[in-house]
Amino acid sequence: MKLHLKGEDLELYSPRIMGALVVHPGEIGSVEDFVRKAKEMQEDGADFIEIGLQVEEGIPEESDELTKLVPIVKAVAQNTSLYVAITTKYPSVMKSAVGAGACLIIDPDALKAKGALETVAMLKVPVCLVFDHNIDFDTEGSLDPMGDISAYLYERIDACLNAGIDRRNLLIDPSLSQSAPIESKLKLIGRLETLKSFALPMTMAMPRSIPHADNYLNEHFSAAVAACLFCVNSGVNIIRTERVAEMALALDTWQAVNKSARPFKLTKAIASRFKRKHAN
């Protein structure tokens, strides 16, 4: 499986990491600060960087995304070798960001906004269709989300193909919303292999931590790392995370013990990460 990005094919035979560069509307920070953060994520093991605006309530304003995100996209694209993704539902932001150097679109609305399908078909860049975070699941977690996820993604993929978007430019992300019950999230992770039937690259947004009744797990990252490894083993190609260094180290280690090919090179990669951490 592969993606065509920046005029070349990127193989996805091994898991990739997408660093999440989160921007807040009222945040005081220069474009150079975000470029520095992106470079740090690249050094820690990210191949991709996603740039998105996060608000406390509701959805970001289109004007805020244009003024805040596009300059950062341009600077990161010009100053790193990362594959830059823009996270947005607005066609105008998609167009401006791709013009500034983004080579991938992540749409939390799965191209349902007016003009989004036509814009992506015209831009001819890969797009990631994210599951609808407005769909609620019961608080007891007895509802298996996979039926809703499969039906939703099937409908959105069909809409993309009917709009003239090349199937080779489609990715899917079944991630549930932050407010979804942990039981539903774990059921989703446990059944990820079901989505292999779509035969499309799959991304997964991994949280800083996975909620758990145990306070120890609430405060530590171990559960999220374990879930990440299970996701990759179940067919996820790209992990989206703010915690790039920890995820990269876990994936490198998993690769080293899971793959018989080139174990020495993988082991050296792990050792170099430890050395960088101690040096800092």
Language model: regions and residue ranges:
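Structural preference for beta-strand elements that scaffold enzyme active sites
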Residues: 16-20, 47-50, 83-85, 103-104, ...
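Active-site-adjacent loop and "lid" segments of alpha/beta metabolic enzymes
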Residues: 5-6, 12, 27-36, 58-77, ...
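Conserved, mostly hydrophobic/aromatic
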Residues: 21, 41, 45, 105, ...
